Swiss-Prot record:
Compositionally biased region (Basic and acidic residues): 78-93, 132-149
UniProt xrefs under Pfam families: Dehydrin
Biased composition (Gly residues): 100-117
Stretch list, region Disordered: 1-149
Keyword Ribonucleoprotein attributed: no
Name of the protein this chain belongs to: Dehydrin Rab15
Induction info: By abscisic acid (ABA) and water stress.
Keywords for this protein: Stress response
Listed GO biological process terms: cold acclimation; response to abscisic acid; response to water deprivation
Keyword Disulfide bond part of the UniProt annotation: no
InterPro entries documented for this protein: Dehydrin, Dehydrin_CS
Family assignment from sequence similarity: Belongs to the plant dehydrin family.
Length: 149
């Protein structure tokens, strides 16, 4: 794209999307994981095409799972995090403790027991490490998940 009277000025070159071209002949010296390949273009001339290569990382997880009724459903953020944590319950996602009590779903009213069998949890009291370090996000998430003591 040329602007009024600024022909062949490399500082003002942009591609069809408005992105500036790199200066000083950096076309063959790209540091990204792209490679150039000449492909046949119009009238038999070669055109340069950039090819973006994927990293090949296998750390991603599927965003859907079997819904138990022959179909698929999207996973939520909680399920994805549970899969990545060690000791996560991938197959047994809904596990409620059974028992009798008069305190409702959160235990018999004393703060012990509960829907996930977490006896003795009293909130944030005593949750610090004693060294003045703050907990990370993953530590906070691990505390909230059942079976991660």
């Amino acid at each position: 794209m040329e602007f009024q009277g600024q022909h062949d000025n490399p500082a003002n070159r942009v591609d069809e999307y408005g992105n500036p071209f790199p200066l000083a002949g950096a076309w063959g010296e790209r540091t990204r994981s792209r490679h150039r390949r000449a492909v046949p273009g119009p009238q038999g001339r070669a055109q340069d095409r950039w090819i973006l290569h994927r990293s090949g990382s296998s750390s991603s997880s599927s965003s859907s799972e079997d819904d138990g009724m022959g179909g698929r459903r999207k996973k939520g953020m909680k399920e994805k995090i549970k899969e990545k944590l060690p000791g996560g319950h991938k197959d047994n996602q809904q596990h409620m403790a059974t028992g009798t009590g008069t305190g409702g779903a959160y235990g018999p009213g004393t703060g012990t027991g509960g829907a996930y069998g977490q006896q003795g949890h009293t909130g944030m009291a005593g949750a610090g490490t004693g060294t003045g370090e703050k907990k990370g996000i993953m530590d906070k998430i691990k505390e909230k998940l059942p079976g991660q003591h």
